[in-house]
Amino acid sequence: MNTLLMSLIFTTMTYEMPKLPYANNALEPVISQQTIDFHYGKHLQTYVNNLNSLVPGTEYEGKTVEEIVAAAPDGAIFNNAGQVLNHNLYFLQFAPKPSKKEPAGKLGEAIKRDFGSFENFKKEFNAAAVGLFGSGWAWLSVDKNGKLHITKEGNGSNPVRAGLKPLLGFDVWEHSYYLDYQNRRADHVNALWNIIDWDVVEKRM
């Protein structure tokens, strides 16, 4: 298991919550403590609990969450595994005071190559996140050839299903932003850029 991608702990028949590298109120005002308490403490905990109830006795017992998402058909196991994977990547990509405003190194070079500039990338990514109908996720991923892709994933899906490696994900389920932004999804998406820990995202390459 890639520990940089999968920091939730897996033991026999048990999936556990990832440990946040910041306090529940540390991302304010972008994400409030109340949202973290509910989104991380309630929603993600429910997905983890559900997965621990669903997997034992199935062909997915002993598999990592990433392996389950890549192989499972649509259904309860896939939905909960997808949301555990998605939220693990999501919550661990943030920092209260990121060390830089945009990626550098290999990821920064790839963004300029594939999107022209970081600003062009942000515009395309924002359009995907804001334009996704209903609940789901916007992702930046990389394929086996090193090319970057922006994808929209409905509900609990994840780019690993298409053989891609997810690097950066924005949650646009209403539960991720409604307490702070109500129906203003675009404001939520724009604000998230201020707390992205590009050091973490770069290591996922």
Task: Briefly describe each language-model feature range.
Residues 2-11:
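Sec-dependent N-terminal signal peptides
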Residues 12-205:
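Feature for soluble, non-membrane regions of globular proteins
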